[in-house]
């Protein structure tokens, strides 16, 4: 594994975001209305650059961020998945986040990558609890959270809308 690679699964390599990823993130995720349905809207190129910078700061400060998900064999961009600090009711909680390009939906990539992040968070980083913050209408994302063993905890108000919090406590 090179220094930029964070995790590897059977099919996916998760690596740190780089400035060069901005165009791909914009073109395949942030400018696709279907992918962004449950977000507050599409992101423009400036917002995409800020997103990459935010993830780079998280990586430097916390050692975790949303990582670029690539096909391990071909290097093709699949999406993003990783762990980011989020505020939930005045507490910092480590969130597993995932978003994949539409053409890769239905292939189990989100579940595979999210499970790897969960394992990393609990086994390598010793996080006591991890969460997924999900728009209640996003049934596909809820299924991913449930398949990796997360359970509905509560609904909070975040990002100017109701957000369902799914949680899982450490394996230990």
From Swiss-Prot:
Pfam families hit by this protein: Acetyltransf_3
InterPro entries noted in UniProt: Acyl_CoA_acyltransferase, GNAT_dom, N-acetyltransferase
Gene Ontology MF terms: acyltransferase activity, transferring groups other than amino-acyl groups
Stretches of the chain forming a coiled coil according to its record: none
Domain N-acetyltransferase as annotated: residue spans: 12-172
PANTHER family named in the record: GNAT FAMILY, PUTATIVE (AFU_ORTHOLOGUE AFUA_3G00765)-RELATED-RELATED (PTHR43792), N-ACETYLTRANSFERASE DOMAIN-CONTAINING PROTEIN (PTHR43792:SF1)
Protein name: Uncharacterized protein YkkB
Species the sequence originates in: Bacillus subtilis (strain 168)
Gene: ykkB
